[in-house]
């Protein structure tokens, strides 16, 4: 809900849904922004799909290197405690703000962790929005998972069922769902 609150309050043409535990090369931010403002994309992932993720173990050496490098992302590039992994969806998305709102924003019926990151790009593609990527690295700072930030959360089955139901909808049904879902009606002043 808070993400949608911020989306509605934003005044910029480009907005970013950004997890605080990731960092990208500076060029990725600029390319993602340009893809929206100059090339007409509606949704851009600022990292590649496939083997583009580095899982980074945060330790005192990394913190020291980060501070001593004037906060340069090169501290992550040079950090030994990282391993290559896959990347698909989640972490950060750049949006054309208007398209994000028209496409339903963040689905508030997903609760806690799970399946919202899978549903979002599928929805935007199926609704005809232009979705793209920046083929570059993502550094994900590994962290402890609580019950609510993993597949162990008590809402995971409901989230999965919602995702499966939305996947089965035609583009017209999906558009109708997002046009009439309660949280969007409230935001647009309808009951």
Question: Language-model segments: which ranges?
Answer:
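Conserved catalytic core of nucleotide-sugar-dependent glycosyltransferases
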Residues: 7, 25-108
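Short, solvent-exposed loop/turn segments at secondary-structure junctions
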Residues: 21-23, 49-52, 100, 137-139, ...
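C-terminal catalytic/acceptor-binding lobe
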Residues: 87, 109-191
